[in-house]
C-alpha cells in the first residue's frame, strides 16, 4: 500500500543552538558561521554575483540536494533581492529554486533554526508562513509576489530525480550539491544522483559543493561535468566546483506524453471562469501579453459562478496519480488563496466527509488507511462530529481541517480585475466559432464576423471545449447540475464546517445568511433551466443521509432560489491540462505503439494550442496548481509535478493508454 506522508527530520539542538540530525549524527550548518560558508561555497562557487547581471534570460534556475533548514535558499534569496535592487533593468527578473529533502523539518524546528540568522528574518518569515505539510512530491511556493519560486520535493532525491518529467532536462543553471557529509549519508552521494545532475544541468551550467571527496569529483566527471578544486571555507582545505561544458543528448522516457512550450510570449485565452482567470495571472507573472475572450457579457457566468464551493481534496486508495495530484493541488490552493491580494468571501472552517451508508464508510476507511498527515485529513468518530461540525448526524467520517468554502464567482471576478491591472485585455460577448492556422499564428473567428490573430491560444472554456474541429474528439463530457440556495435557520446557523455526504451543505455565508446545498448531477446534459425536481432532490438527499437529524428536515427550498451550471468532466476525474492533441495524427503515428515503443515519436499536437479543461466538481482545488503547471509548460520552465502524475493530466492520456495496450481508440 502506498503511504502519503513523509517522515519529519529527527533532530536536536546542540549547545550552540545548531540543529543536529540524530539519524546522521551531523550538523545542518556550521557551528562557526554557516551563513558565510553558504555565501562562499554555493553563491561564490557558482559565481552568481557575476552571472546574475549577465544572465540572458528572465529566469535563473538553481537546484539543490538537501533543503535542510533552508539556509542556502534564504541566503540566495537575499542576494537575489540585492541584485534586483542594484540592477532593476537587468534581463534577469525571477529566481527559481528547486530542492529535494527526504526528512523535512517541522515548521516549529524550522523557525527555531532560523533564529540563528536575524538578518535573514524578512525572508525566513515568508518561508515559514508557507511551509508545506509533509506530503510526498513537489510543493510549489510562490514568494515575493511570484518573483521567487521554490519547488520543494519531499522524498529521497535518488528516487525523485528518476521520476522527474523530461521537460526539466537541461533547465538548471546552477547546482548546490549539499547535504550531510558523504561519510555520514552515503546513500545520497551516488552515481545516479551525479548523472541526474548532469541531465538536468543547462549547457554552461555550474555546480558547487563543500566536499572535496575523490569519489564525488570522479563521479561528477563521469557524469559529464568538468571539475576543479577550490580553496575550502574556513578550516576546510578544499571544495569542488564544476561546469557543464558539453551538451549531453536528451533522453526521452515517454515521448507519447511529451509536453512542448512556446518561444512566443503572446497568447489568447478563450474562457471566462476560474481557469482562465488564474491562468491569466500565471502567464502575466511570466511576462506574457495576454488577451481573454469571453462569450458571456461578464465573467463567471458558467460553472465558476456559484455562491459557495467546497475546497477539499479528492482521494482514493486505488489511484496513486489522483491522490498525488489532488493532495498537492489542495495544499497549493490553500497557499495560493491565502496570499492572493484580492477579496472574496471564504471561510477555512474545515470540511467533514461523512460515512452515511456502508459504501461511503468503506471508502472513508480506505482513505484513512493511507497514512495521511494529520494536517491533511483525520478520522472523526460519530460522537465527535457534532462537536466539530456543530450539527448531529450520527455518522463518523474524515475531516479535512484546512478545507472550507469560498465564493467562486467573486474570486473569478476579482482575480480578473487584478489581472487587468497587470495588463490583461478582456473582450466580452466574443463567442469563438472556429480557429485555424495562418502564417504561424492562430486565426480566431468569432460570431458576428469578428476576427483576431494570436501567436498562442489556450482553450479554457469549460464544457464548450469540444466544439472546435481540433477538440471535437476529446474524451470529455458535460454535467449539468443545480445548487440550491437556502435561508439559514437557528439550527442550520450552528453548522461550523462544510458537510459532504451524498451531496454537500455549506455553513451560511454571513454576507447573505444563506447556505448552498447540492448538487444535482445530469451527465451528458447542458440544460441550465431551473428544475423543481432538482430543488427537492437536493433537500431529500440530505434527509435520506441523516434521517434522525431534525435540522435536516427544516431545510427550506420553497423560495426556488438556485443556480444551474454545466461542468466539464472526464471519467478518470482528473483535469486535462497541456497541449491540444491531434487525434488523427495520434492514430496514424501510434498505430503500432504497443509493439514499437522504442521508435515512438513525440506526441502529435497542434502547435501553440493548449487546453485547460475538465475540472469537474473540484475546480477550486485543482485550478490554481493546473494554472501553474500550464503556465510553466507554455513558458518552458520547470513544472511542479512528477512525470507519472503529469502524464495523468495529459489531454491525450486516455487514447495513449489504449494504444500502449494495442487496443482500438474511439473519438470522444
From Swiss-Prot:
The UniProt record lists the keyword Flavoprotein: yes
UniProt GO cellular component terms: cytoplasm
GO BP field: tRNA methylation; tRNA wobble uridine modification
Subcellular location: Cytoplasm
Coiled coil, from the record: none
Predominant location: cytoplasm
This protein's UniProt keywords: Cytoplasm, FAD, Flavoprotein, Methyltransferase, Multifunctional enzyme, Oxidoreductase, S-adenosyl-L-methionine, Transferase, tRNA processing
Catalysis performed (reactions): 5-aminomethyl-2-thiouridine(34) in tRNA + S-adenosyl-L-methionine = 5-methylaminomethyl-2-thiouridine(34) in tRNA + S-adenosyl-L-homocysteine + H(+)
Cofactor: FAD
Record EC number: 2.1.1.61, 1.5.-.-
Result when mutating residue 567 to A: Loss of activity, but no change in FAD binding
GO MF assignments: FAD binding; oxidoreductase activity, acting on the CH-NH group of donors; tRNA (5-methylaminomethyl-2-thiouridylate)(34)-methyltransferase activity
InterPro entries documented for this protein: FAD-dep_OxRdtase, FAD/NAD-bd_sf, MnmC-like_methylTransf, SAM-dependent_MTases_sf, tRNA_MAMT_biosynth_bifunc_MnmC, tRNA_MNMC2, tRNA_S-uridine_synth_MnmC_C
Region FAD-dependent cmnm(5)s(2)U34 oxidoreductase, annotated ranges: 270-668
Effect of residue 271 to Q: 4-fold decrease in activity, but no change in FAD binding
SUPFAM superfamilies, per the entry: FAD/NAD(P)-binding domain (SSF51905)
Keyword DNA-binding belongs to the record: no
Function: Catalyzes the last two steps in the biosynthesis of 5-methylaminomethyl-2-thiouridine (mnm(5)s(2)U) at the wobble position (U34) in tRNA. Catalyzes the FAD-dependent demodification of cmnm(5)s(2)U34 to nm(5)s(2)U34, followed by the transfer of a methyl group from S-adenosyl-L-methionine to nm(5)s(2)U34, to form mnm(5)s(2)U34.
HAMAP family linked: MnmC
Sequence similarity: In the N-terminal section; belongs to the methyltransferase superfamily. tRNA (mnm(5)s(2)U34)-methyltransferase family.
Name under which the protein is recorded: tRNA 5-methylaminomethyl-2-thiouridine biosynthesis bifunctional protein MnmC
Species per Swiss-Prot/TrEMBL record: Escherichia coli (strain K12)
Amino acid at each position: 500500500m502506498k503511504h502519503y506522508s513523509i517522515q519529519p527530520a529527527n533532530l536536536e539542538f546542540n549547545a550552540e543552538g545548531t540543529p543536529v540530525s540524530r539519524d546522521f549524527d551531523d550538523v545542518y550548518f556550521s557551528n562557526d558561521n554557516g551563513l558565510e560558508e553558504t555565501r562562499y561555497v554555493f553563491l561564490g562557487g557558482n559565481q552568481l554575483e557575476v552571472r546574475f547581471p549577465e544572465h540572458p534570460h528572465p529566469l535563473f534556475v538553481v537546484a539543490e540536494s538537501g533543503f535542510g533548514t533552508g539556509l542556502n535558499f534564504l541566503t540566495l534569496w537575499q542576494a537575489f533581492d540585492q541584485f534586483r535592487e542594484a540592477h532593476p533593468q537587468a534581463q534577469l527578473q525571477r529566481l527559481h529554486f528547486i530542492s529535494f529533502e527526504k526528512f523535512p523539518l517541522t515548521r516549529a524546528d524550522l523557525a527555531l533554526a532560523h533564529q540563528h540568522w536575524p538578518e535573514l528574518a524578512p525572508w525566513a518569515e515568508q518561508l515559514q508562513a508557507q511551509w508545506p505539510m509533509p506530503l510526498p512530491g513537489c510543493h510549489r511556493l510562490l514568494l515575493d509576489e511570484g518573483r521567487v519560486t521554490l519547488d520543494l520535493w519531499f522524498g529521497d532525491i535518488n528516487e525523485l530525480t528518476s521520476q522527474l518529467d523530461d521537460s526539466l532536462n537541461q533547465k538548471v543553471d546552477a547546482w548546490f550539491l549539499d547535504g550531510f557529509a558523504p561519510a555520514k549519508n552515503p546513500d545520497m552521494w551516488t552515481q545516479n544522483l551525479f548523472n541526474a545532475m548532469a541531465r538536468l544541468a543547462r549547457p554552461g551550467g555550474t555546480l558547487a559543493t563543500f566536499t572535496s571527496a575523490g569519489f564525488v569529483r570522479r563521479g561528477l566527471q563521469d557524469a559529464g561535468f568538468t571539475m576543479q578544486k577550490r580553496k575550502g571555507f574556513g578550516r576546510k582545505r578544499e571544495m569542488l566546483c564544476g561546469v557543464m561544458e558539453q551538451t549531453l543528448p536528451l533522453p526521452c522516457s515517454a515521448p507519447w506524453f511529451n509536453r512542448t512550450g512556446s518561444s512566443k510570449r503572446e497568447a489568447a485565452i478563450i474562457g471566462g471562469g476560474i481557469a482562465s482567470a488564474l491562468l491569466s495571472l500565471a502567464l502575466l507573472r511570466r511576462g506574457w501579453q495576454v488577451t481573454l475572450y469571453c462569450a458571456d457579457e461578464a465573467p463567471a457566468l458558467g460553472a465558476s459562478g456559484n455562491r459557495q464551493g467546497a475546497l477539499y481534496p479528492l482521494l482514493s486508495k486505488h489511484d496513486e496519480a489522483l491522490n498525488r495530484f489532488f493532495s498537492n493541488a489542495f495544499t497549493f490552493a490553500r497557499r495560493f488563496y491565502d496570499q492572493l491580494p484580492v477579496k472574496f468571501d471564504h471561510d477555512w472552517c474545515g470540511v467533514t466527509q461523512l460515512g452515511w451508508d456502508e459504501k461511503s464508510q468503506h471508502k472513508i476507511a480506505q482513505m484513512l488507511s493511507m497514512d495521511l498527515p494529520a494536517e491533511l485529513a483525520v478520522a472523526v468518530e460519530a460522537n465527535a462530529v457534532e462537536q466539530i461540525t456543530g450539527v448531529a448526524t450520527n455518522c463518523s467520517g474524515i475531516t479535512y481541517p484546512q478545507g472550507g468554502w469560498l465564493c467562486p464567482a467573486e474570486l473569478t471576478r476579482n482575480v480578473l480585475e487584478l489581472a487587468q491591472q497587470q495588463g490583461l485585455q478582456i473582450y466580452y460577448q466574443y463567442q469563438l466559432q472556429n480557429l485555424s492556422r495562418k502564417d504561424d499564428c492562430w486565426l480566431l473567428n468569432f460570431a458576428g464576423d469578428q476576427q483576431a490573430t494570436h501567436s498562442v491560444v489556450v482553450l479554457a472554456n469549460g464544457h464548450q471545449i469540444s466544439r472546435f474541429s481540433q477538440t471535437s474528439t476529446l474524451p470529455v463530457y458535460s454535467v449539468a447540475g443545480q445548487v440550491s440556495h437556502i435561508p439559514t435557520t437557528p439550527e442550520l446557523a450552528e453548522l461550523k464546517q462544510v458537510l459532504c455526504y451524498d451531496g454537500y451543505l455549506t455553513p451560511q455565508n454571513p454576507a447573505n445568511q444563506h447556505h448552498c446545498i447540492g448538487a444535482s448531477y445530469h451527465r451528458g446534459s447542458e440544460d441550465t433551466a431551473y428544475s423543481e425536481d432538482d430543488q427537492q432532490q437536493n433537500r431529500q438527499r440530505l434527509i435520506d443521509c441523516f434521517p434522525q437529524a431534525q435540522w435536516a428536515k427544516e431545510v427550506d427550498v420553497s423560495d426556488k432560489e438556485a443556480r444551474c451550471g454545466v461542468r466539464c468532466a472526464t471519467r478518470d476525474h482528473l483535469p486535462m491540462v497541456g497541449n491540444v492533441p491531434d487525434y488523427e495524427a495520434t492514430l496514424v503515428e501510434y498505430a503500432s505503439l504497443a509493439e514499437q515503443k522504442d521508435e515512438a515519436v513525440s506526441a502529435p499536437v497542434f502547435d501553440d494550442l493548449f487546453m485547460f479543461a475538465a475540472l469537474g466538481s473540484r475546480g477550486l482545488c485543482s485550478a490554481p496548481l493546473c494554472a501553474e503547471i500550464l503556465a510553466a509548460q507554455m513558458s518552458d520552465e520547470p513544472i511542479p509535478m512528477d512525470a507519472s502524475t503529469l502524464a495523468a493530466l495529459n489531454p491525450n492520456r486516455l487514447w495513449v493508454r489504449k494504444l500502449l495496450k494495442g487496443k482500438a481508440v474511439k473519438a470522444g
